[in-house]
Design a protein with these regions (language model features):
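Short, intrinsically disordered N-terminal pre-domain segments
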Residues: 1-16, 336-338
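Elongated alpha-helical scaffolds
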Residues: 69-84
């Protein structure tokens, strides 16, 4: 089943979901705690309505795990007998009547513990845990990680088929100027046609289709913290894959020194003569005081060496620029519900 169909099935609002009883001992933390590379348990007690029955699940209840596969998102279901089961199926319950109440990402490598990147041991990303009251604001929480309990970031760079894969998936072709993404159905896509390139405009539009945004400079600096600074990968990665040296504290993978990512910020030169400029691809014109409107690139690319890093940024490129070393990464707000 495609991500697009998953999103179409997500018809209830978050508040409607919570209205079906889900009450944790505290709303100030996520329900789950990582207890090992591939194990987890509840870290607070919770009462959950499953069908017509309210089930009490105590703190310290283990989640039954399947054989975990690196780079995969798992849903956590509460069974009618009170047990917890993780599966990689996010739409069909593992047993009749089970209710999905959270999930996590099983990453291909560990998060950074200092400012020297992560490791290559596949494990649960503890910052990817979510539940019905602690989650990203976008409809689909998969492939995301919580940055400093402030906002959520896509773990992976944008891929070429986000309607199928979501905007953040492991082992797929990275979207860039040479391999632009398919136009999302929300903006008239037919499942086949791609953008002509990957300009700032396309980046913002793609993420908007899934309830996300490109990061601000401040957000990027935070999400990329913990990478091995002033280093690059050395070659075009082509696909979303582990680059442990440039994994951040929060488990953002290929965070720097792989492909540049478009930012949300734009700047305009206030000098010269202001005129209307036809630079918005047939969707109106932009009044600026210089030849163009500029946007930021963050993180550094695979050949940038010491220029790459969590605070690396370029501010000299037009919003209409597109190239093979420019991609995107989505972010969205953090939601806490009582």
């Amino acid at each position: 089943m495609t991500r697009a169909r998953d999103l179409a099935n997500f018809t209830r609002s978050i508040s409607d979901t919570i209205a079906e009883r889900f009450s944790k001992g505290t709303s100030e933390t996520v329900l789950w705690s990582k207890t090992g590379d591939g194990t987890a348990e509840t870290q607070v007690d919770v009462r959950v309505e499953v069908g017509n029955t309210v089930i009490a699940v105590p703190e310290g209840t283990s989640v039954s795990m399947p054989s975990l596969s690196a780079g995969t998102d798992y849903a956590i279901w509460l069974e009618t007998d009170g047990s917890l089961q993780a599966t990689n199926n996010h739409t069909t319950p593992p047993s009749t009547g089970a209710r999905k109440i959270g999930g996590f990402h099983y990453a291909p490598g560990g998060n950074a513990t200092a400012q020297s990147g992560g490791n290559s041991t596949a494990q649960i990303n503890e910052y990817s845990f979510y539940d019905l009251g602690w989650r990203p604001s976008c409809p689909d929480p998969r492939g995301m990680t919580l940055v400093s309990e402030n906002f959520w970031s896509d773990i992976y760079l944008l891929n070429t088929d986000p309607d199928t894969n979501g905007t953040s998936a492991f082992g797929v072709t990275i979207a860039d100027g040479s391999s632009p993404p398919r136009i999302p159905s929300a903006f008239g896509g037919n499942g086949t046609t791609t953008y002509g390139g990957f300009k700032w405009y396309e980046c913002q539009e793609v993420f908007a289709a899934y309830g996300k945004k490109a990061p601000t400079y401040a957000e990027f600096m935070a999400l990329a913290y913990g990478v091995t600074e002033e280093t690059d990968r050395g070659s075009d990665p082509g696909t979303t894959q582990l680059d442990s040296a440039r994994t951040s504290k929060w488990g953002v993978i290929q965070a720097t020194g792989n492909l540049l990512v478009w930012g949300r910020d734009v700047i305009a030169d206030g000098t010269g003569s202001g005129v209307w400029r036809d630079i918005a691809e047939g969707r109106g014109e932009i009044f600026t005081f210089n030849d163009d409107l500029l946007a930021g690139f963050f993180g550094g690319a695979w050949g940038d060496g010491a220029k790459a890093g969590s605070r690396s940024s370029y501010w000299s490129f037009s919003v209409s620029y597109s190239d093979t070393f420019v991609s995107g990464r989505g972010v969205t707000d953090h939601v806490i519900l009582p």
